[in-house]
């Protein structure tokens, strides 16, 4: 199973990330590949999956950011979002990506964070 992990600019809580990814792994134990877009998310994913035999990478799918995000959700089985609507930077972009996942009838999980 291939997943994509999406987070907003302000998201930087590894402990929350780890806790929520533990929930994901329990529900989806057959994850083999993880795609990310944001550097901090990639850093978290690599750290989290380092002993779980999961390959993490940032594929270069397009030039424009929104197109990259759309393609990420198109090529994966499950999209995971760390999201807060009230975050000024990135909230609209993330919302558009979530809408795209819904339109494609793909599986997704949203974790709303506090800080």
Regions found by a protein language model. Name each.
Residues 1-16:
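Glycine-rich phosphate-binding "P-loop"
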Residues 12-115:
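Acidic/glycine-enriched connector segments
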């Amino acid at each position: 199973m291939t997943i994509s992990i999406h987070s907003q600019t302000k998201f930087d809580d590894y402990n929350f990330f780890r806790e929520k990814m533990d929930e994901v792994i329990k529900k989806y134990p057959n994850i083999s590949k993880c795609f990310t877009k944001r550097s901090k998310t990639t850093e978290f994913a690599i750290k989290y999956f380092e002993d779980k035999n999961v390959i993490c990478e940032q594929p270069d799918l397009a030039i424009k950011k929104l197109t990259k995000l759309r393609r990420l959700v198109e090529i994966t089985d499950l999209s995971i979002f760390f999201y807060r609507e009230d975050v000024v930077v990135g909230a609209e972009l993330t919302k558009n990506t979530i809408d795209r996942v819904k339109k494609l009838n793909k599986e997704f999980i949203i974790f709303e964070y506090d800080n």
